[in-house]
Amino acid sequence: AYPAAFPDEVIEVMAAEPKICKYLDIPFQHISDAQLAAMHRRHTKAEAMELIRRLRTAIPDLALRTTLLVGYPGETEADFEELLEFVREVRFERLGVFAYSEEEGTYSAEQLRDDVPEAVKQERVERIMALQNEISLENNRRRVGRTERVIIDSRQGDFYVGRTQYDSPEVDQEILIPVGERRLLRGHFYEAEVTSAADYDLYGEVRTK
C-alpha cells in the first residue's frame, strides 16, 4: 500500500473484519519534505503522519511495516536526522532500510548527481537499524505473556518455526516453539503463549487444551 490517497475503506474493513491480518506494509521511503519532493513522492510529511495517526487509532493492534531509503541525491544531515526522529516517534513494528544506488534508466540516475558518499550512506543505514533493533526488542518484550495465534511453517532442529498475523513470510520475525511431545503440523494454526523475546524473534509454547 502507498501513502498517497490511502483509502479509508481499507482502514474500516481491516478494523472490523477479524479474518484480515492486522498488518500493513506502507513504503514511506523518507519523511523530509525536501526528500519526498526529490523522489517525486505524492505525499508530504504531514500527510504521512496523519495517515499513521488514523491507522493507529482505528486499528490499535496494527503491525506497521515500512521501507526507507537513505543517501538519495541531495539528502542532507538534517534530512537524515528528521528521518531518524520519524523512526523514533512512530516505532514501526517492522522496518527495512536501504542505501541509494543508481539504477540505469531511472530519473535519479539520469538527472541527479549521486552526491552522498558511500560511507555516509552505510553509516545512515546502520544508525537507523541500530535504533530499530532497540524498538523491535522493546515491542517484542511487551508481547511476553500474551497468547498469539501461530501458523507453523517448518521444523528446524529442536524448534518449530511459526509466524503470527503480524509477520510476513521470509521478511519478518518468527516465533520459535520447542519441539515437545505434541507434534505440530506445518500449515496448521495453534494458540501459543509468548514466553521470551529477542530483538527479531519470539519464543513460545503451545497451550494445551
Descriptions of predicted regions:
Residues 5-9, 28-40, 70-77, 93-119, ...:
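Flexible glycine/acidic-rich beta-alpha junction loops that bind and position SAM and/or redox cofactors
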Residues 110-209:
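Terminal RNA-binding accessory module
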Residues 1-80, 88:
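Conserved SAM/AdoMet-binding glycine-rich loop
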Residues 26, 67, 87, 95, ...:
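Conserved, mostly hydrophobic/aromatic
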